[in-house]
Amino acid sequence: MIPGEIITQIGEIELNSGRSTIQVIVANTGDRPIQIGSHFHFYEVNSALEFEREPTKGMRLNIPAGTAVRFEPGDEKEVELVAIAGSREIYGFNSLVNQKLE
């Protein structure tokens, strides 16, 4: 075994199984690239990203941990979001929520 190595069972592992997801079309209206990490509360991302925000409250990108999605200036793409699990307490980020979600 190598330090830090993870040995999993044979077969596929389904990420975020059973959690609610939504599809959102996002456009970068800014003049600089914007990168969003896997566990950032999507509702609170950079204001230069244009999309319908309210449905994204309590959601994050449905991508593997430690990865990110990059939006170049003028880019428009569809992303899948997944509900944040655990205690569903959202604090920090851009301080738009700072409370436990319902």
From Swiss-Prot:
Coiled coil: none annotated. Pfam families: Urease_beta (PF00699). InterPro entries: Urease_beta-like (IPR002019), Urease_betasu_sf (IPR036461), Urease_subunit (IPR050069). It is found in: Cytoplasm. The keyword Metal-binding does not apply. GO terms for biological process: urea catabolic process. Its EC number is 3.5.1.5. GO terms for cellular component: urease complex. Its main location: cytoplasm. Pathway: Nitrogen metabolism; urea degradation; CO(2) and NH(3) from urea (urease route): step 1/1. The keyword Iron does not apply. Keywords: Cytoplasm, Hydrolase. It catalyses: urea + 2 H2O + H(+) = hydrogencarbonate + 2 NH4(+). One of its GO terms (molecular function) is urease activity. It is an enzyme of class 3 (hydrolase). Belongs to the urease beta subunit family. Heterotrimer of UreA (gamma), UreB (beta) and UreC (alpha) subunits. Three heterotrimers associate to form the active enzyme. This is Urease subunit beta. It comes from Trichodesmium erythraeum (strain IMS101).
